[in-house]
Amino acid sequence: MGSDWDEIKRLAADFQKAQLTSTLQKLSERNCVEIVTLLLEKQMLEVVFTNDGKEYITPDHLEREIQDELYVNGGRANLVEVSKTLNVDLSRIEVLAERIAAENPSVHLVLGQLIDEDYISHIAQEINEKLVQRGEISISELASQFDLPSDFLQHDVVEKHLGKIIKGRQDASNPRVFFTQAYIQRCKAKIRGALAAITRPINVAVILQQIGVQEKIFHSLLDEIAPAGQVTSKQANSQYVPHIYAKTQADWVNSFYKQNSFLEYDAIQKLGISDAKSYIRKQFPNEEFLFLKRVALGARLVELTVVTALNECSATKQYLDLTTILPSNLSEEDIEEVFSTIMAQKHSNPSNFVYLDGIVFSQPYLAQLVQPCKALAESQAKAAIDGGVYQQYIVEKTLAQKGNVSTQELEDDGKVDKRDERRKKASSGKAGGGAQGRETKTKSTKKHQRGKAAAQFDSDDEDDVQQGTRGGGGASKKAVKPLELVKTADIVKLITASLEEEGLEHLSKPIAALYTNQFNQTALARAQELFEATPQTNRRQTHAAIQDRINTLLIDIRLYEKGLKLFPQDTQTQLVKYLLKSLGNEICNELSLYVASECNLTVKNTNLNVDQRNKLAQECEAQYRAALLEQNKALNKSIDEFELATETVLKSCSMIIKKVDKKKDRLLIADHKRKLQKQLLECHEPALLLHLAALILFTTITGSILHASGKFVSAILQHIRGSLNEEQNALLLRYHDLVLQVLQATPDSNESKLANEHLQAMQTQVVELAQNFSRASVSKAD
């Protein structure tokens, strides 16, 4: 029993020992991979794989290895090389390098490289040694030597250690250059010695080449040295001029200017002065100069000589030879430049003078010289008319312009304009507002020559050469050559004798060329006047007058149409019919009489009815016949259809329809209203007075005009009733009833006499209402 208990104790002790003893078991590679994979999936572990994928490492350990590589490489490590050495992807290396640089102020990340302060101190020592050897160094040289950015070298290396490791100073004018004080002293000594030995002007570049000093240092130290001379500028081609030489130059220039009052740039440049203009300004700071291309003229010479002579020339109406008052060594180009510059600077009007080969002519002198040419232009114009030359010229220009008009129409064929819209409305059979009025060029199928030579142009016709038409196929017409009635040779013959007396006959052709175009235009204008004065041109004037009259009537119809559209449909139809029977009939008569005149038909009665116009149209030429007949039919149709028919007639007559200018509508309406008011003041017949008053009130209230006869007065009063107060309506209604009573009663009856007395008493009130009523007093909204 005791042995069993001992056995139990022994087993318990073994069991306890087994529990307390740690057992080391070696896992297989597969198990390790599975464990690591599981940890990665549960994001309990972060590792970085190598490029071959066989190994991995934690980011912290990789960071330590990057720092070790930085230390091994002497404080400067290229991340690409580190990536190859550690066999880790470059992007991982760059991320950790940025973290290292951010966490450690002594480490810098520069262009894919890690650089620590030890390396910076090392290159600072190298820079200091180089600066001591050379005396001067620039950041660009250091950037090339150390393969580092210039900004990094300047701010984090040189400027940071300047005065500590690097013994030198920074150039104030160029912060990217550094030098030692000893170097500056050596440069000063070289410059001082070189300048002391110079006795004549010499290029600064030559001096710098001899003494081996940089140009920027030379110019910065020059003022400190205070040499016995001066440098012309800080540019590449500057010169050093000793004071003794500069004094000799100044004496010569001063002496020459005092004697001649001008200076030549070439003479100054021969003295060794490169910029003559700047030297003159510097040498004579209180003098005013007129700087030309080759010379500089003093203000004394310009004011006292040239300007005075020009003023005298203008006052005496003569000419001035500038070569006699300017220095003899000035060329013709110099003299012309003097004249042009004086005209600009002195604010003179160049049109008062004419410059030719060194001689200035006043305009009155030339006008007197060419005075005989006016008679020449008159005689040439008469000869052109008598010989038919001008008429032939007009015919050619007429044909050329018609060709241009045809081309313009072809180009406009594809455009949808207001004519198309109106044509659609007319075809739909709806009456209403026309949209006529745009300016459209039309051409006849027959060449109309109104008069002997188709006088289709004004006196402006003799301007430039007419341009050829631009057809779609590329064909172009030949340009019409301008008519030359007065030629240069004709003017030369007239003025040569006068110029020979002054010894200026060599200028006869240039002077004649100046006035050829002027007198030719004068002759053409005179020829046009003579041409228009002939009986053949009366038809052209009639054409223009008819065209203007028709356009005016069409504009009136358009404005009246807006007013009648405000009425109910039944009243509107009657107003349209009345409008066409009155104004439309007038348009038909005007065009029918014009066409009859074109076709050489005799018309005894000018007030034609529809049958007479139809009969007349049958006798006209075929190109007019259909259009006139259609226009007569359109009088019984809508306004749109009538306007389209009228447009066709105008086209056959080579007339244009003026473009609608709605900005002028208000002016036309206001003018129409003023005319009605004037008639109202002069009217004493009750029925007409009421008619005029109703039309005026309608225009004031609606802003539109109306063309209506007396039978529409009641409809007009009914339309405007809502815009008048009770007293005004009662006045008009009472006056209307009295007018009807007078019209219905016999003239001599007591009823008629009594009604006339009442009308006479109320006349002043009706007139005042029509004259003084304004839209501001309208009780209802318009």
Curated annotation (Swiss-Prot):
Annotated coiled-coil segments of the chain: none
Top EC class of this enzyme: transferase
InterPro entries: Ufl1, Ufl1-like_C, Ufl1_dom, Ufl1_N
Region (Disordered): 405-478
Keywords recorded for this protein, A-Z: Transferase, Ubl conjugation pathway
UniProt-listed Enzyme Commission number(s): 2.3.2.-
GO process annotations (BP): protein K69-linked ufmylation; regulation of proteasomal ubiquitin-dependent protein catabolic process; response to endoplasmic reticulum stress
GO molecular function (one): UFM1 ligase activity
GO cellular component: endoplasmic reticulum membrane
Pfam families with a match to the protein in the record: E3_UFM1_ligase, UFL1, UFL1_C
PANTHER family in the record: E3 UFM1-PROTEIN LIGASE 1 (PTHR31057:SF0)
Assigned protein family: Belongs to the UFL1 family.
Summary of the function given for this chain in its UniProt record: E3 UFM1-protein ligase that mediates ufmylation of target proteins.
Record-given protein name: E3 UFM1-protein ligase 1 homolog
